[in-house]
Amino acid sequence: MKKTLVVFAHPYLEHSHSNVELVNFYVRHQHFTLRDLYEEYPDFHIAAFRERKRLKNYDRFIIQFPIIWFGMPPLLRLWIDEVFDRSWLKDDVENPLEGKEVYIVVTTGGKERSFSKTGTYQYTIDELISGLIVSLNIFKAKIMDITIVYEANKLSKKEIILQKQKFISILNQ
Protein backbone atom coordinates (compact mmCIF):
# COMPACT_ATOMS: atom_id res chain seq x y z
CA MET A 1 0.00 0.00 0.00
CA LYS A 2 1.16 3.52 -0.74
CA LYS A 3 2.53 5.67 2.05
CA THR A 4 -0.19 8.30 2.49
CA LEU A 5 -0.23 11.67 4.22
CA VAL A 6 -3.64 12.81 5.39
CA VAL A 7 -3.90 16.59 5.72
CA PHE A 8 -6.97 17.04 7.86
CA ALA A 9 -8.52 20.36 8.87
CA HIS A 10 -11.70 20.56 10.92
CA PRO A 11 -12.05 23.30 13.53
CA TYR A 12 -15.02 21.58 15.21
CA LEU A 13 -14.08 17.91 15.04
CA GLU A 14 -15.88 17.08 18.27
CA HIS A 15 -19.16 17.82 16.43
CA SER A 16 -18.45 15.67 13.36
CA HIS A 17 -19.14 11.95 13.63
CA SER A 18 -18.53 11.44 9.90
CA ASN A 19 -15.04 12.91 10.02
CA VAL A 20 -14.19 11.09 13.25
CA GLU A 21 -14.96 7.74 11.61
CA LEU A 22 -12.46 8.35 8.81
CA VAL A 23 -9.87 9.84 11.16
CA ASN A 24 -10.09 6.69 13.29
CA PHE A 25 -9.54 4.59 10.16
CA TYR A 26 -6.38 6.53 9.25
CA VAL A 27 -4.99 6.25 12.78
CA ARG A 28 -5.47 2.48 12.85
CA HIS A 29 -3.54 1.82 9.61
CA GLN A 30 0.22 2.06 9.40
CA HIS A 31 0.29 3.32 5.79
CA PHE A 32 -1.52 6.51 6.76
CA THR A 33 0.00 9.45 8.60
CA LEU A 34 -2.66 11.81 9.93
CA ARG A 35 -1.82 15.48 10.36
CA ASP A 36 -4.65 17.33 12.07
CA LEU A 37 -3.85 20.94 11.27
CA TYR A 38 -6.04 22.35 14.05
CA GLU A 39 -4.34 20.07 16.55
CA GLU A 40 -0.85 20.76 15.25
CA TYR A 41 -1.18 24.51 14.65
CA PRO A 42 -3.72 25.93 17.15
CA ASP A 43 -1.91 29.28 16.97
CA PHE A 44 -2.04 29.29 13.12
CA HIS A 45 1.79 29.59 12.96
CA ILE A 46 2.66 27.03 10.30
CA ALA A 47 6.17 25.60 10.07
CA ALA A 48 6.23 25.79 6.28
CA PHE A 49 9.77 24.46 5.84
CA ARG A 50 8.98 21.39 7.98
CA GLU A 51 5.73 20.82 6.08
CA ARG A 52 7.47 21.03 2.69
CA LYS A 53 10.07 18.53 3.86
CA ARG A 54 7.30 16.22 5.12
CA LEU A 55 5.51 16.23 1.76
CA LYS A 56 8.55 14.67 0.06
CA ASN A 57 8.19 11.50 2.14
CA TYR A 58 4.79 10.42 0.83
CA ASP A 59 3.47 8.66 -2.27
CA ARG A 60 -0.02 10.10 -2.09
CA PHE A 61 -2.10 12.60 -0.18
CA ILE A 62 -5.60 12.88 1.20
CA ILE A 63 -6.90 16.35 1.95
CA GLN A 64 -9.98 16.15 4.15
CA PHE A 65 -12.08 19.00 5.45
CA PRO A 66 -15.63 20.31 5.91
CA ILE A 67 -17.11 23.14 3.92
CA ILE A 68 -17.22 26.14 6.25
CA TRP A 69 -18.95 29.27 5.05
CA PHE A 70 -18.77 28.02 1.48
CA GLY A 71 -15.08 27.29 1.40
CA MET A 72 -12.19 25.53 3.06
CA PRO A 73 -11.49 25.98 6.76
CA PRO A 74 -9.24 29.02 7.28
CA LEU A 75 -6.30 27.03 8.64
CA LEU A 76 -6.25 24.75 5.59
CA ARG A 77 -6.30 27.77 3.29
CA LEU A 78 -3.39 29.27 5.26
CA TRP A 79 -1.51 25.94 5.18
CA ILE A 80 -1.76 25.86 1.38
CA ASP A 81 -0.69 29.52 1.13
CA GLU A 82 2.32 28.93 3.39
CA VAL A 83 3.44 25.45 2.28
CA PHE A 84 2.90 25.38 -1.48
CA ASP A 85 6.05 26.97 -2.88
CA ARG A 86 6.16 28.69 -6.26
CA SER A 87 9.78 27.60 -6.64
CA TRP A 88 8.40 24.06 -7.23
CA LEU A 89 7.33 25.30 -10.65
CA LYS A 90 10.94 25.75 -11.77
CA ASP A 91 12.51 22.98 -13.84
CA ASP A 92 15.50 22.44 -11.56
CA VAL A 93 13.56 22.32 -8.26
CA GLU A 94 11.97 19.18 -6.82
CA ASN A 95 8.20 19.48 -6.70
CA PRO A 96 6.93 17.15 -3.93
CA LEU A 97 3.43 17.14 -5.43
CA GLU A 98 4.31 16.42 -9.05
CA GLY A 99 2.79 13.17 -10.23
CA LYS A 100 1.54 12.28 -6.74
CA GLU A 101 -2.00 11.05 -6.25
CA VAL A 102 -4.31 13.35 -4.31
CA TYR A 103 -7.73 12.45 -2.94
CA ILE A 104 -10.00 15.18 -1.62
CA VAL A 105 -12.68 14.38 0.96
CA VAL A 106 -15.21 17.10 1.69
CA THR A 107 -18.04 16.98 4.20
CA THR A 108 -20.94 19.37 4.36
CA GLY A 109 -24.10 19.70 6.37
CA GLY A 110 -26.01 20.80 3.27
CA LYS A 111 -28.03 18.72 0.86
CA GLU A 112 -26.61 17.75 -2.50
CA ARG A 113 -29.33 19.62 -4.38
CA SER A 114 -28.44 22.82 -2.48
CA PHE A 115 -24.95 22.73 -4.03
CA SER A 116 -26.01 23.00 -7.66
CA LYS A 117 -26.52 25.79 -10.17
CA THR A 118 -30.24 25.73 -9.48
CA GLY A 119 -29.99 24.96 -5.76
CA THR A 120 -30.06 27.18 -2.71
CA TYR A 121 -26.40 28.22 -2.97
CA GLN A 122 -26.11 28.19 -6.79
CA TYR A 123 -22.54 26.85 -6.62
CA THR A 124 -21.21 23.31 -6.70
CA ILE A 125 -18.70 21.98 -4.19
CA ASP A 126 -16.10 21.81 -6.99
CA GLU A 127 -16.62 25.53 -7.59
CA LEU A 128 -16.36 26.32 -3.89
CA ILE A 129 -13.04 24.46 -3.60
CA SER A 130 -11.73 25.54 -6.99
CA GLY A 131 -8.73 27.32 -5.40
CA LEU A 132 -7.50 23.99 -4.03
CA ILE A 133 -8.14 22.20 -7.33
CA VAL A 134 -6.31 24.86 -9.35
CA SER A 135 -3.38 24.85 -6.90
CA LEU A 136 -3.00 21.08 -7.13
CA ASN A 137 -3.21 21.20 -10.92
CA ILE A 138 -0.58 23.94 -11.17
CA PHE A 139 1.77 21.86 -9.04
CA LYS A 140 1.12 18.85 -11.31
CA ALA A 141 -0.50 16.65 -8.68
CA LYS A 142 -2.92 14.02 -9.97
CA ILE A 143 -6.36 14.55 -8.45
CA MET A 144 -7.70 11.02 -8.38
CA ASP A 145 -11.06 11.61 -6.73
CA ILE A 146 -13.16 14.19 -4.95
CA THR A 147 -15.46 12.50 -2.44
CA ILE A 148 -18.26 14.67 -1.13
CA VAL A 149 -20.31 13.61 1.87
CA TYR A 150 -23.53 15.62 1.92
CA GLU A 151 -25.61 16.07 5.07
CA ALA A 152 -22.71 14.57 7.01
CA ASN A 153 -24.16 15.72 10.32
CA LYS A 154 -27.37 13.75 9.72
CA LEU A 155 -25.89 10.39 8.69
CA SER A 156 -26.63 7.34 10.80
CA LYS A 157 -23.75 5.21 12.10
CA LYS A 158 -24.50 2.69 9.33
CA GLU A 159 -24.50 5.40 6.63
CA ILE A 160 -21.18 6.76 7.95
CA ILE A 161 -19.64 3.28 7.77
CA LEU A 162 -20.93 2.86 4.20
CA GLN A 163 -19.40 6.22 3.22
CA LYS A 164 -16.11 5.15 4.78
CA GLN A 165 -16.15 1.81 2.94
CA LYS A 166 -16.92 3.55 -0.34
CA PHE A 167 -13.95 5.88 0.13
CA ILE A 168 -11.64 3.01 1.12
CA SER A 169 -12.59 1.16 -2.07
CA ILE A 170 -11.74 4.29 -4.08
CA LEU A 171 -8.31 4.37 -2.43
CA ASN A 172 -7.74 0.70 -3.25
CA GLN A 173 -8.47 1.04 -6.99
Question: What residue spans do the PLM features occupy?
Answer:
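Generic recognition of short, well-ordered alpha-helical segments
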Residues: 17-21, 46, 74-78, 158
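Helix-loop-strand module that forms the ligand-binding subsite of alpha/beta enzymes
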Residues: 49-133
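A short beta-strand-loop structural module common to alpha/beta enzyme folds
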Residues: 29-45, 150
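N-terminal beta1-alpha1 ligand-phosphate binding loop
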Residues: 1-35, 167-168
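Glycine-rich phosphate/pyrophosphate-binding loop and the adjoining helix
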Residues: 23-27, 129-173
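Hydrophobic/aromatic beta-strand patches that form the interior of the parallel beta-sheet core
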Residues: 5-7, 33-35, 62, 103-105, ...
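Charged, often glycine-rich, active-site loop that binds/positions anionic groups
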Residues: 47-53, 159-163
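A short helix->loop->beta-strand "cap" motif at the edges of active sites that frequently abuts
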Residues: 2, 97-101, 141
